[in-house]
Amino acid sequence: MLFFRGINSINMDAKGRLAIPKRYRESIAEASENQLVATIDLHSPCLLIYTMDEWEVIERKLMSLPNMDPQARLVQRLLLGHASEMEMDGQGRVLLPSLLREHAKLEKEAILLGQGNKFELWSQEAWDASRPEMLDSASVGDVSESLSSLSL
């Protein structure tokens, strides 16, 4: 399993292509033959980017949700409906569909954030606006039950 970590400032060209940082390219090529999938994030103004093999795991989980449950159908509709396959070219570039670029308000400057099994792709502007609030939220308030046993 691949593990993506770190924060990367990247640029998107006028055609909507962005270059995956070199340190990830070989691993992506080996794990999923240069195939990536991007979809929207349901909670933040960013995109989620998975290797194809990791996305297929997510896709199976989504499809196993009960389709008579309106919330489950909504999540399926949004995540699967916005999922777009992308192929990394020989220069490590991927072409982001315009609908996804518009959703995340992506322009030239962007942030690619490693999140373990996936990347988050943020516009520089949205990242700069959201980061202070995220830092404040992380430093104060109640710790959820799922985080209470985490030791760093």
From Swiss-Prot:
InterPro entries linked to this entry: MraZ (IPR003444), MraZ_C (IPR035644), MraZ_dom (IPR020603), MraZ_N (IPR035642), MraZ_sf (IPR038619), SpoVT-AbrB_dom (IPR007159), SpoVT-AbrB_sf (IPR037914)
UniProt-recorded name of the protein: Transcriptional regulator MraZ
Domain of life according to the entry: Bacteria
Residue ranges constituting the SpoVT-AbrB domain according to the UniProt record: 7-54, 83-126
Gene: mraZ
Entry annotated with the keyword Cytoplasm: yes
Assembly with partners or alone: Forms oligomers.
Principal subcellular localization: cytoplasm
Subcellular location(s) per record: Cytoplasm, Nucleoid
One Pfam assignment: MraZ
Annotated keywords: Cytoplasm, DNA-binding, Repeat, Transcription, Transcription regulation
Disulfide bonds: none
Gene Ontology biological process terms in this record: negative regulation of DNA-templated transcription initiation
Transcription regulation as UniProt keyword: yes
UniProt-recorded Gene Ontology molecular function terms: DNA-binding transcription factor activity; transcription cis-regulatory region binding
Cellular component, GO annotation: cytoplasm; nucleoid
PROSITE patterns found in the cross-reference section: SPOVT_ABRB
SUPFAM superfamilies: AbrB/MazE/MraZ-like
Gene3D superfamilies, sorted: Transcriptional regulator MraZ domain
Family of the protein in this entry: Belongs to the MraZ family.
